Amino acid sequence: MADPADVKKLSFETAMEELESIVKRLEDGKVPLEESVAIYERGEALKRRCEELLRTAEARVDKITTDAAGQPTGTAPLDVE
């Protein structure tokens, strides 16, 4: 298992791919208990990394604001809730 510090270096896609692999291994139920705990902890770190990257991307997304005539006037933070 890789060093937890390297999770911070992973791209979203790489972290998500590894997380999906961990979930599959745990769901299969063929991993010994001690190893299950270790890969679960790795999965938690990967989940946090993915959430961090998604929050960062969300903060960068803007919506285009328009005037009454529909002409662009600028941008504003995108309200996704």
Curated annotation (Swiss-Prot):
Its EC number is 3.1.11.6. SUPFAM superfamilies: XseB-like (SSF116842). It comes from the Bacteria. InterPro entries: Exonuc_VII_S, Exonuc_VII_ssu_sf. It catalyses: Exonucleolytic cleavage in either 5'- to 3'- or 3'- to 5'-direction to yield nucleoside 5'-phosphates. GO terms for cellular component: cytosol; exodeoxyribonuclease VII complex. GO terms for biological process: DNA catabolic process. GO terms for molecular function: exodeoxyribonuclease VII activity. It is found in: Cytoplasm. Pfam families: Exonuc_VII_S. Keywords: Cytoplasm, Exonuclease, Hydrolase, Nuclease. PANTHER family: EXODEOXYRIBONUCLEASE 7 SMALL SUBUNIT. Bidirectionally degrades single-stranded DNA into large acid-insoluble oligonucleotides, which are then degraded further into small acid-soluble oligonucleotides. Belongs to the XseB family. Heterooligomer composed of large and small subunits. NCBIfam families: PRK00977.1-3, PRK00977.1-4, xseB. This is Exodeoxyribonuclease 7 small subunit. It comes from Rhodopseudomonas palustris (strain BisA53). The gene is xseB.
